[in-house]
Amino acid sequence: MTAKSVLPLLLLAGLFSGAAAAHGHHHDKPQTEAQRKAAEGIFADKDVKDRQLSDWDGVWQSVEPYLASGELDPVMQAKAAKNGDKTAEEYRAYYTKGYKTDVDMIGIENNIIEFHRGDKVDQCEYQYAGYRILNYTSGKKEARYLFECKDKNSHAPKYIQFSDHIIAPEKAGHFHLYMGNESQEALLTQLDNWPTYYPYTMSGKDIVHEMLHH
């Protein structure tokens, strides 16, 4: 496979709007009760289905800069007011650790993923490696979708896992991405760092609205 950037193709073709469309999808098409419960981590193992990498096609941005700039403060304040278990500042510290990443932008198309770290870009074609269901002490569950880079010459993460509160084929509106080079099993133990990505077309204000209302 020739090494060419996914992003120009996505941007020129306007395909990155597919990610924005996924964002809009959650507004335009009401979720079923099962989808709502799955998003909350409540689902039966038998309802989890395989998914293709195309569910995450598009251009995505890390939300870490928005947290660092203070733009996500309304979200932290809302969480503190609603849950009462942490102050807004404690939530901010929790999410600072969770969102931490050096991958500021991701492009996905035709099973190829580009990882942008500033001016540095690494890419690889990824193969599906199944899904895993994690069970938490709270009684909630998480479905992670596993993919692997088989190109030994690539500097992209060898193992990745998507988690987006969806358990069956559906376009993602945002996602958490676990990345590493050790093994899928090692990533499954990663619970406190979950780099989070929203469509590149969304502003900080858009992301705040999405987090508060969806």
What are these language model-derived features?
Residues 7-8, 40:
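Short, functionally important structural connectors and interaction interfaces within domains
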Residues 91-160, 164-166:
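Contiguous, well-ordered beta-strand patches that form the walls/edges
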Residues 16, 75, 128-130, 138-141, ...:
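Surface-exposed beta-strand edges and their flanking turn/coil or helix-capping segments
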Residues 1-7:
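Bacterial N-terminal signal peptides that target proteins for export
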Residues 19-87, 167-214:
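Amphipathic/hydrophobic helical signal segments and adjacent flexible N-terminal regions
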Residues 8-15:
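Bacterial N-terminal signal peptides
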